Amino acid sequence: MFSFVDLRLLLLLGATALLTHGQEDIPEVSCIHNGLRVPNGETWKPEVCLICICHNGTAVCDDVQCNEELDCPNPQRREGECCAFCPEEYVSPNSEDVGVEGPKGDPGPQGPRGPVGPPGRDGIPGQPGLPGPPGPPGPPGPPGLGGNFASQMSYGYDEKSAGVSVPGPMGPSGPRGLPGPPGAPGPQGFQGPPGEPGEPGGSGPMGPRGPPGPPGKNGDDGEAGKPGRPGERGPPGPQGARGLPGTAGLPGMKGHRGFSGLDGAKGDAGPAGPKGEPGSPGENGAPGQMGPRGLPGERGRPGPPGTAGARGNDGAVGAAGPPGPTGPTGPPGFPGAVGAKGEAGPQGARGSEGPQGVRGEPGPPGPAGAAGPAGNPGADGQPGAKGANGAPGIAGAPGFPGARGPSGPQGPSGPPGPKGNSGEPGAPGNKGDTGAKGEPGATGVQGPPGPAGEEGKRGARGEPGPSGLPGPPGERGGPGSRGFPGADGVAGPKGPSGERGAPGPAGPKGSPGEAGRPGEAGLPGAKGLTGSPGSPGPDGKTGPPGPAGQDGRPGPAGPPGARGQAGVMGFPGPKGTAGEPGKAGERGLPGPPGAVGPAGKDGEAGAQGAPGPAGPAGERGEQGPAGSPGFQGLPGPAGPPGEAGKPGEQGVPGDLGAPGPSGARGERGFPGERGVQGPPGPAGPRGNNGAPGNDGAKGDTGAPGAPGSQGAPGLQGMPGERGAAGLPGPKGDRGDAGPKGADGSPGKDGARGLTGPIGPPGPAGAPGDKGEAGPSGPPGPTGARGAPGDRGEAGPPGPAGFAGPPGADGQPGAKGEPGDTGVKGDAGPPGPAGPAGPPGPIGNVGAPGPKGPRGAAGPPGATGFPGAAGRVGPPGPSGNAGPPGPPGPVGKEGGKGPRGETGPAGRPGEVGPPGPPGPAGEKGSPGADGPAGSPGTPGPQGIAGQRGVVGLPGQRGERGFPGLPGPSGEPGKQGPSGSSGERGPPGPMGPPGLAGPPGESGREGSPGAEGSPGRDGAPGAKGDRGETGPAGPPGAPGAPGAPGPVGPAGKNGDRGETGPAGPAGPIGPAGARGPAGPQGPRGDKGETGEQGDRGIKGHRGFSGLQGPPGSPGSPGEQGPSGASGPAGPRGPPGSAGSPGKDGLNGLPGPIGPPGPRGRTGDSGPAGPPGPPGPPGPPGPPSGGYDFSFLPQPPQEKSQDGGRYYRADDANVVRDRDLEVDTTLKSLSQQIENIRSPEGSRKNPARTCRDLKMCHSDWKSGEYWIDPNQGCNLDAIKVYCNMETGQTCVFPTQPSVPQKNWYISPNPKEKKHVWFGESMTDGFPFEYGSEGSDPADVAIQLTFLRLMSTEASQNITYHCKNSVAYMDQQTGNLKKALLLQGSNEIELRGEGNSRFTYSTLVDGCTSHTGTWGKTVIEYKTTKTSRLPIIDVAPLDIGAPDQEFGLDIGPACFV
């Protein structure tokens, strides 16, 4: 029955379930029972005595177990409850008789203990005393219920239910009050804790032995006797028959009431008494340690308005103005451009036939032949390697309890228990032989002190003192030595094909290699069939252009050309007369928001918000500590009978030993049967406290009392833990043959088989893909004059001519496109109210409202089901020594024992002379644990620790990008003959070549190794001998290796103290222009273009990575060196680009950082003292939360009066509720911070993208991020663009002053000079917020790059007489800046598009003597290239050449 579960316990367990449940996705399962839908894990009572639970979609029901044997005349039953109970005022007739009410005792602490008088007769039991103060904390609780109970709890957590309301923190306890007046005698309380021992009285004389009293109750079991001498081993008994394992029984009925427990140890201090009179104020105490972090204070008043932001960038260009008046007629234009080319002339006569062309390239392979018939199944392959473990399946529903398993193997022997206490004296033995000479008599006069004994064993570790003040941080460790190289990284993707290089000159002829061994004669091959004629080859390439034809006749005049471009703007005309006054301006934009008004009254509490989305599952925690010992298991089956021992011989009794030291108090035995009630004696007056006397002699053992009446059956017990595994059963019969296994993975390739017979030729293959264009052949002979070409495309527009005479008026133009949207008109008068619209759609779920008032305590939950039996837990730690067992039966007469221990000391002898100093005493046994010491003062600062161990090798970095392909070099001259090379390794197997003509019969080959039998192939057609095929392409990259094992999760560091809020930073510069749109998808590969004219020599490329050795190509015929073509004419300059648009407005300034947390509220007044609480519950289950502060749940009262009472004063419950609710509030705050970080210094987000997803309505601004997670002390401040989710990291020095930075020693020799590396006052660009550690920023940027797919950055180059990108004088980009990325790749203005940047504004194209600027933008998906760390201009070095830089933020998304 779960009636003992208190709602607060469920609340707290629910919170822990929330932590796990919130990070898992539990599918929504429910049960339908008699038309009622019940969520998974909920319990309900369809009938009063029937309880059901929804378990994974199935309703499981059971009867409620009741205690039917109620010992009262009129049991009562509450409405809706199944089980009856006795009213509280009813007293069972079986309870003890109540004696005469004693005099009312004075309240106050228990007095000192009186002396022990002679044992008197048992008095009648007195009136029940006042309720005692709270009992001591209970024993450690059972181990946590583990997975099954946690899952049952998590099912009870309803995702749709309201959140847990959380009150404020508990105030400090008030001072202890004075004792209250004595109350009326209450009901019988629990056994109070023993009072503090009184001052020891003087020892009284030993009284005379009193007469034997009436038989008393059975005493506690005696302390364990000394271990008996081991008997001789008996003969082995017969092996018992193995019993069948029984099935696990259902949980038993409620057991009988247990016996009263032992007196507990001294209890904790009771609850605070009523408030005493205020004392005189004490001196100020030493400052205490910093308290725990207070709850957030109330929201502060709005701060004063911030200072005005920096001026924004120029606004966008305004709309075009109205057209001006018609200008005067221009001068006549220049003559028109040459007319278009004339129409093609008639086709000429067919020319004479040219010489035969060069042999065409091999045709594409034919289509694949039809599939042949399936071959016979081959032999089974070797069994494949074991597959990887599959993903864990969905957990099945708990099964019914299985049959009790056989006992597991015997666990390891526990450590030897402590020495048992002395046993009761045995029965007197037979008189022994005369003993050896007795020990020396009583000690003489004390000798001089002996030497100091050995140091005693170290006592048990005391309770840890309070934490000392934190020591100062140690010195920063030096950098670790370089780690070992990491493992090879995964092969990078195949790089793009480089441009085909020009063929190099033929190398010198190598010296002849060594002669090969003659092969064994091969079998003569059969003559191949004549191959079918090949399909016609592809059309040959277009030949080189013929010589220029004769000049044609002048064509007719062309149509008039397109209107030329507008001429250069003339000088400004004279100032016009003043215009008419303009119209009234439009309504202005709304003014800035006014000052924030005073805070309004607190609104009413909103409705509870919907729970947030589930967070991601946390990483698996470390192995927890071993749990405390589990519940007592069910009794195991009776073991086989032991071997009977041989009867021992009667030993000679030894001398009576000296009394041993008093052993530790044994656990209290079960109470004996109740004795016969003695006659009531008169109540004597209360005596004065006497001094404690010596212990009296032990009385005779009383006769056993009559058995008491049977108690009521106890509550139904929780199911015990699963018993230990039994011994393994006998080997089962051989199982049936299993089903045929799945096909094994293909075996390794077998050894090469013998050459098969030549098959018939296959059918013609499908035409293959068009091969890549081969190198240009030598120029052919001059062909006949070709036919006139088609009309060429229109050439580029010529330069602008002078304006021609004005033309005649044109036709009326077509209707223009709609104009731009006009300015907003003045607001019209309000229209009449429209009819009421239909109700709108249901809005989205609102944000969570403020916390509602605390709900009333819910009714006790319904009874839960017993959980399924847990798995067998790991063996618990060795248990404490058990209580002493009952005395065994008297053994048979043993043999003569060893010499007895020393008898009691004889009468003291005469004092002897002082003895010599004794030897050093034996090491003393460890003393008992001392009380916890007061906290020590903080120790001095420790010396800095040694340098850390060299770090483990880092992971291998990503494979570098392939270098740019270098330009084709000019063919070198033929070199001298080289020395003979060694025979090269065979190249990779190429694809089969085209069918060739039949070959001649080869020599007989040597027999190959025997291959594994292949499937019978269908007889193939005989194929022609093919030509040598071209080398095959390199194979696809191998599959990536299996991911390495996940490293262990690091421990969470302690959260640092909140630092003081820093001063507001200066207003940052205006933001850079917004990012360009995302890069479009990559286009399809274009067809190979025709070969262009030979270009001019390019810049020298970077050295590429060494490629893998290519397969040897077939040797080509050495062609004659082609004639070098003449340099082409210089092309006309391109038309000037249209001017770029003005930049967008800058981003709004960042939001200020959140204000500091408010101070903790003042402590509330101390509450009124509550009555003493019930005894503490058993300790918490291991590994869970500490529930020891919860009030105990009420019990269903039975005739024993119940074990617990609910406190009458609700304040006790409220105080403890406050602790629970505070804990819950802290928990929920932490969960919320994990699931939805706020981007502050204490709670940084991972990236701005995370912040945007969690808080889509937040504005762009500066926030804190911690991409590598872990401790937040290395978080960095970045700018978050909330519209794009970009994380922008600013440089620590965003601008380089505009001045002359470099004077070249040789001004004529222009080369790129790196600003940070080579210029005298230059510096590399570093990134991060002000005051951040560059090493921390570098690590954070590494993680940020890994979590981003695109990066971009802008750099503005301010120039004076320095070209930044396009050189207006030459029209090329040879003087463009170089940028160096973070991975040291250089980014250029021209070349491979993957390593080039673009410009948004280019105002540095010529030397004008004035300052201009060029804005460079680089955007890439290779995030490791950004941010840019250095810039190298080329056009600098003269005294009048100056430049400066503005470095924009690197933005990642």
UniProtKB/Swiss-Prot annotation:
Q: Which UniProt keywords apply?
A: Calcium, Collagen, Disulfide bond, Extracellular matrix, Glycoprotein, Hydroxylation, Metal-binding, Phosphoprotein, Repeat, Secreted, Signal
Q: What GO terms fall under cellular component here?
A: collagen trimer; collagen type I trimer; collagen-containing extracellular matrix; cytoplasm; extracellular matrix; extracellular region; extracellular space; secretory granule
Q: Where is the composition biased (Gly residues)?
A: 198-207, 474-483
Q: State where Ca(2+) binds.
A: D1266, N1268, Q1269, C1271, D1274
A GO molecular-function annotation: platelet-derived growth factor binding
| Span of the signal peptide | 1-22
Ranges for the region named Nonhelical region (N-terminal) are 152-167
Establish whether keyword Transcription regulation is in the entry: no
Q: Please list the residues that carry the modification 3-hydroxyproline.
A: P874, P1153, P1168, P1171, P1174
All copies of domain VWFC, residue ranges: 29-87
Q: Where is it localised?
A: Secreted, Extracellular space, Extracellular matrix
Q: Name one GO biological process term.
A: protein transport
| Phosphoserine found at | S161, S260, S776
Residue stretches in coiled coil: none
Give the matching PROSITE patterns.
Answer: NC1_FIB, VWFC_1, VWFC_2
Instruction: List each copy of the Fibrillar collagen NC1 domain by range.
Output: 1218-1453
- Per the record, which residues fall in region Nonhelical region (C-terminal)? 1182-1207
Propiece residue ranges: 23-151, 1208-1453
- What SMART domains does the record point to? COLFI, VWC
Instruction: Explain the post-translational modification.
Output: Contains mostly 4-hydroxyproline. Proline residues at the third position of the tripeptide repeating unit (G-X-Y) are hydroxylated in some or all of the chains. Contains 3-hydroxyproline at a few sites. This modification occurs on the first proline residue in the sequence motif Gly-Pro-Hyp, where Hyp is 4-hydroxyproline.
Oligomer and partners: Trimers of one alpha 2(I) and two alpha 1(I) chains. Interacts with MRC2. Interacts with TRAM2. Interacts with MFAP4 in a Ca (2+)-dependent manner.
Please give the family membership noted in the entry: Belongs to the fibrillar collagen family.
Protein's UniProt name: Collagen alpha-1(I) chain
Q: Which organism is it from?
A: Mus musculus
- Lineage of the organism: Eukaryota, Metazoa, Chordata, Craniata, Vertebrata
